[in-house]
Amino acid sequence: LSPEALHKRNIKALFEKPEINVLIALVAICIGLSFASPYFLTAKNIVNILRQFSLIAILAVGQAMIIITGGIDLSVGSVVGFTACFGAAVARMGAPPGITLLSILGIGAVVGLTNGLFVTKIGIAPFIATLGMMSIARGLSLLITMGVPIHVDPTWISVFGGGYVGIFPVSVITMLMIVGIGFVFANNTTLGRNVYAVGNSEKSAKFSGIRVDQVRIMVFTITGVLASICGLILVGQLEGADAFYGNGYELDVIAAAVIGGVSLSGGEGNVLGILVGAALMGVLKNAFVLLAVPGYWQVVATGVVIIGAVSLDSLRRKRTAK
């Protein structure tokens, strides 16, 4: 191929990547909103957007790994609420910071591990197993709070939700660290490559000596821990916990992952695309607020975005198959 033809092919391949198209859409939406609202590009609003989508991005890293292996986790939102309530209750009892932190992360890991065991050892479909866990976690949240929000006096825990390092919120720095770790894990470790191998072909992965069940249990457990981190951040931001924290997060997280190029068929997706997808979701939610669009339209928009992203992925796969 001539240098010119090679250059054209590289440009075409670049624009065929879902995350690049989403990034272009994100930039276009931001430009449009900067004209539609004088508040969009203010420093305060930009920080609000970053804080808003940081939780979705953290959860989407875990959700993406599960989807890439061919599964799905509908319980992430409820687990966020459950770990937040559990952590707030422990903190309110006067437990030392280290004990409180370990208990929050530990309970998230246990929930994720339980999901993984249900799927691999009992053979329950991920959709059903996590749907059941969604109900269990929400019910446990109500039992802990007795339907009344738990208030936590501003302590060390508030640093996670409301603290800053320079001009950046701690929650945003936490998100960037998790995205960075996720990127290295997915691209530079054997375990990360095994996640993709399981999603591409479970049978081939088994023949290659990959312990498929262990990989699936691992990604569910990681997602549980990430949900507990989000629960901790919410307690810090709002100085307390409510049984309905995280309600609806599962759809936002799935949308962010799918928009970012994670295929619901499994075996495909990358962490940087997930970050862009989460950012797009955050900007869209912020746009609804700035433009005074009724809140229920946000739910409609999320559904439209998921269907649209899945449809585009399906069309792209059919075109590639030809």
Q: Could you tell me what each predicted segment is?
A:
Residues 227, 237-303:
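Transmembrane alpha-helical segments in multi-pass inner-membrane proteins
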Residues 181-221:
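Membrane-helix/interface signature in polytopic inner-membrane proteins
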Residues 211-235, 247:
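Transmembrane alpha-helices
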Residues 31-93, 117-124, 257, 261-271, ...:
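Single transmembrane alpha-helix segments in multi-pass membrane proteins
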Residues 94-134, 276-277:
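Alpha-helical transmembrane segments within multi-pass membrane transporters and channels
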Residues 122, 126-189, 215-218, 237-246:
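Transmembrane helix-bundle core of multi-pass membrane transporters
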Residues 1-25, 180, 207-214, 286-322:
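Cytosolic-side transmembrane-helix boundaries in multi-pass membrane proteins
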Residues 1-60, 94-100, 210:
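Membrane-interfacial amphipathic/re-entrant helices at transmembrane-helix boundaries
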